[in-house]
Amino acid sequence: MLIDWFTIVAQIINFLILVFLLNRFLYKPIVKTIKARQQEIENRWQDAEKEKKSAKNEANSYQKKQQELEEKKQEIMIQAQTKADEKYDNLVEEARQDVEQKRKTWDESLEREKAQFFDRFQEKIMQQIYKITGHVLGDLANASLEQQIINQFIHRLENLSEKERENLANSLNTTDNGLIIRSHFEISPESRNRLLSSLQQTHIYQGDNVQFMTNSDLICGIELQASDYKIAWNLKDYVEALEI
């Protein structure tokens, strides 16, 4: 059997040409298309992963912001509650202080009114005692109450302590107004002379600058004043001394 080398070579050449043509016009485009498709898929996959990661980050960020907002909300609520409590406490304290001040003012007003009432009451009682005592003494001893008060005051002057004499002398040295003698009633000229004579005999005051005045507050009483120092005897002081 003879081998036709020409035919074999021609077929080999045709095969190679066919392989080249197939590779050039069929396989390479297909492979290129497949690779391009794979690259596209890979790119889409990577994009999807990126979007997934981004979405996850956004979700985490949103969750974090939500948590921060919740914490801020709680903080604001706590602050608001604290301020509300402080405001309530302040209002309660202001109300308490206002009530306390009003109560104190009311108590002080009540005390003043009570003191004024008792002062007026005592004043009226003293006046009644003054009138009644004057009538009683006048009826029983044939002497007026005024005269008895003068006698009692002269006795008081005659028995001054050394300290009282010293204080009176010091006060007389600090004033040019002399002495002032006040009484609830008008002192008669005769009683005035008795008082002046007593002042000279007891060496309390040798001058003649003595003023006689009336004072309705001296219930059943009489007082001697030199500058800011005074010596007094009256029923009102006597009663107050008994109260103390």
Curated annotation (Swiss-Prot):
It comes from Crocosphaera subtropica (strain ATCC 51142 / BH68). GO terms for molecular function: proton-transporting ATP synthase activity, rotational mechanism; proton-transporting ATPase activity, rotational mechanism. The chain crosses the membrane at residues 2-22. The keyword Ribonucleoprotein does not apply. Pfam families: ATP-synt_B. It is found in: Cellular thylakoid membrane. The keyword Plastid does not apply. This is ATP synthase subunit b 2. It comes from the Bacteria. Belongs to the ATPase B chain family. PANTHER family: ATP SYNTHASE SUBUNIT B', CHLOROPLASTIC (PTHR33445:SF2). The gene is atpF3. It is a single-pass membrane protein.
